[in-house]
From Swiss-Prot:
Gene3D superfamilies: 3.30.420.40. The keyword Cell cycle does not apply. It is found in: Cytoplasm. This is Type II pantothenate kinase. Its EC number is 2.7.1.33. The gene is coaW. InterPro entries: ATPase_NBD, Type_II_PanK, Type_II_PanK_bac.
Length: 267
């Protein structure tokens, strides 16, 4: 069995390959000791690690492991997944939306990191908790699906009420900028959480589009664990990307790009 692991700040993504079959699983990074214990009990032919906590795992296992730079691993794995899923892209920006967000340009041969922001799944969980007292990510995202941002976010159409706006009316003029105009409204936890996911999605997308224009590509690939069980984030990102004139792409199991890529990088 071959095992690739992307040990991130919040989640550990694990890919196992055996008999041309691939299996995926995740574990919370706070349970890294359990992952180490599991690894030490397996018959592993090849173990490859990436991510910020790769060194912690390598120091505590009784089998040899190779460690790779997470950006290179993610790019390698994403290329494999894109090909397997029928996406033939000459070049693209990819946004890896994990705890934070890392932005990369792939020119058809290699990747280069072109930016990063602190907005991502960590903000959804942290700010989401402050607004709702909910700690479970799935519960947060499930609740957000039913939310309405209309009384929270100020849209361009809210400003240009009786005239044609110079930019699309559905663009957000100010996240949370409509709140003071609706002080008598019932700001439910669902509405507040939907607004949090909205600002995360729009900031990530805006940054991705900015670098896409800089590198003259219209293709943006979104990956990362923040999209897991988060249809609203995916919709926000997809709609906003199209609205701004670019093409969004998602890949199944994209959050495991780093773990897959580590298996196929060679030292």
């Amino acid at each position: 069995m071959k095992v690739g692991i992307d040990a991130g700040g919040t989640l550990i993504k694990i890919v196992q390959e055996q008999d041309n079959q691939r299996t995926f699983k995740t574990e919370l990074t706070k349970n890294i000791d359990q992952v180490v214990e599991w690894l030490n009990q397996q018959q592993i032919e090849k173990l490859c690690l990436t991510g910020g906590n790769a060194g912690v795992i390598a120091e505590n296992i009784n089998i040899p492991a190779q460690i790779f730079v997470e950006f290179d691993a993610a790019s390698q794995g994403l290329g494999i997944l894109l090909k397997e899923q029928g996406h033939d892209l000459a070049d693209y920006i990819f946004a890896n939306v994990g705890t934070g967000t890392s932005l990369h340009y792939f020119d058809g041969q290699s990747q280069r990191r072109v930016g990063g922001i602190g907005t991502g799944g960590g903000m959804i969980q942290g700010l989401g908790y402050l607004l709702s007292q909910i700690t479970d990510y799935k519960q947060l995202t499930d609740m957000a699906q039913h939310g309405d941002r209309n009384t929270i976010d100020l849209k361009v159409r809210h400003i240009y009420k009786d005239t044609e706006p110079p930019i699309p009316g559905d663009l957000t003029a100010a996240n949370f900028g409509h709140v003071l105009h609706h002080l008598d409204a019932d700001f439910t936890p669902s509405n507040k959480l939907a607004a949090v996911i909205g600002v995360v999605g729009e900031v990530v997308t805006t940054m991705a589009i900015t670098v896409a224009r800089e590198f003259k590509t219209e293709n943006i690939v979104y990956i990362g664990s923040s999209f897991h069980n988060n249809a609203l984030l995916r919709k926000v990102v997809e709609d906003y990307t199209v609205l701004r004139g670019c093409k969004p792409y998602y890949v199944e199991n994209g959050a495991f790009s780093g773990a897959i890529g580590a298996l196929y990088l060679e030292k």
